[in-house]
Amino acid sequence: MSIILGIDPGSRITGYGVIRQVGRQLTYLGSGCIRTKVDDLPSRLKLIYAGVTEIITQFQPDYFAIEQVFMAKNADSALKLGQARGVAIVAAVNQELPVFEYAARQVKQTVVGIGSAEKSQVQHMVRTLLKLPANPQADAADALAIAITHCHVSQNAMQMSESRLNLARGRLR
């Protein structure tokens, strides 16, 4: 059993999603947004750090998964996003959590089956996969999708390792 915290970073709204994985079974534990309503960036970063730390304390995850930085058209926005990611990662590292990063395209490909999927498609698939009563808020859905991606990637990696081990032992399944 593993608990995975997914983070969709943003300097104004940071989405989070927490799921439990037991084998192939995924269970929704919680999700939401850390909203930073203050204007100055250092205060927003402090709120993100405190919010992520509080979520880690509440849910005690085993793994921390976060969206990678993408190339933005606006350099200022990209820098702020990078700083928001940084404080979220520091919160995880301070709690000694292993950190995994996934590209947005990989997350969409894993959850929806199309790397260029729209936000509404991600919300719908997250709702379906986790058997939620309604679509989660967009940032929370993205964070849950990141956590789901981590589950699939880590499970596939374990299966490949087992296959390699069996091959090395002369057994093919």
Curated annotation (Swiss-Prot):
Mg(2+) 2 binds at E67. It is an enzyme of class 3 (hydrolase). The keyword Lipid metabolism does not apply. Its EC number is 3.1.21.10. It catalyses: Endonucleolytic cleavage at a junction such as a reciprocal single-stranded crossover between two homologous DNA duplexes (Holliday junction). Keywords: Cytoplasm, DNA damage, DNA recombination, DNA repair, DNA-binding, Endonuclease, Hydrolase, Magnesium, Metal-binding, Nuclease. Binds 2 Mg(2+) ion per subunit. One of its GO terms (molecular function) is crossover junction DNA endonuclease activity. The active site is at D8, E67, D139. Homodimer which binds Holliday junction (HJ) DNA. The HJ becomes 2-fold symmetrical on binding to RuvC with unstacked arms; it has a different conformation from HJ DNA in complex with RuvA. In the full resolvosome a probable DNA-RuvA(4)-RuvB(12)-RuvC(2) complex forms which resolves the HJ. Belongs to the RuvC family. The RuvA-RuvB-RuvC complex processes Holliday junction (HJ) DNA during genetic recombination and DNA repair. Endonuclease that resolves HJ intermediates. Cleaves cruciform DNA by making single-stranded nicks across the HJ at symmetrical positions within the homologous arms, yielding a 5'-phosphate and a 3'-hydroxyl group; requires a central core of homology in the junction. The consensus cleavage sequence is 5'-(A/T)TT(C/G)-3'. Cleavage occurs on the 3'-side of the TT dinucleotide at the point of strand exchange. HAMAP family: RuvC. NCBIfam families: PRK00039.2-1, ruvC. This is Crossover junction endodeoxyribonuclease RuvC. The lineage of its organism: Bacteria, Pseudomonadati, Pseudomonadota, Gammaproteobacteria, Enterobacterales.
